[in-house]
């Protein structure tokens, strides 16, 4: 999971989301339904209401807060869900387990709207794009306090490069104003490997020794590893640099602007390349309401439907036809919609063999403990 989406797991009745009263919900009890499982706070405020209004299908909408919760539910029993929002990183596991149904493109007229370049990247996790529709996506990069980084490194600070955080001289200076990184070996170690010129999805233990050596050298200058605290700390000026998700950095920037506290936050997608992640719409193999599930997926493939979702959440969508409909402030922001040049440098992360996972876990433990 590569987004800050809250920390609770709850079921949201459509009536509460859309302002529909209890009476209308009761009247809809016999209506066809679709059961949807999504990340917490990860849809437009009117999307579900409008879908029910247009289709007559009642969404039953539950949320989760981690990929582990999602995979655990889908891998251990019949979940009862029709459509699930799954990360690209989870797709190989779910496909191998036979949990997903191939998508019949002839029943998804909106498929033609998808960005073929994004589909090509997603195919690294979903070969042939058989199972997953891109919903929203983002990148992992560097969020920074413009003024404090300039004060520490001068006007020529390499804010467009991973040298900002992986060069020891730079990090030693930035450490004085606070540096944070994600507490996520599956996301941080690939970035370190890539910086060293090694495959980000390497299975070679020797490569991880090199990444370990790099991070241990930097460890004294890193304030902490955490996957949520950095958002408020960055927006409040308590730290000056964080490595994390694009949407989280935009959240920090927005929070600082709303607080009018004088903190200027920017997001950089390093020129050497960075991870790109996707959240995708998948249809479960045992979906009890398959036609309604396909109808829900195709609804989200409508440009006029997905564009407001991107505006609301500040994440780009995978729908090329929707781009002109996205608010100018969103679509022209390179932190949200990277340039074609930047897109060419992005890479996806992949699940690794269990033996490599164990190596990675040991390395990360050493790095966090500084030994």
Predicted regions mapped to residue ranges:
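A ligand-binding cleft/hinge motif common to bilobed small-molecule-binding domains
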Residues: 90-93, 241-262
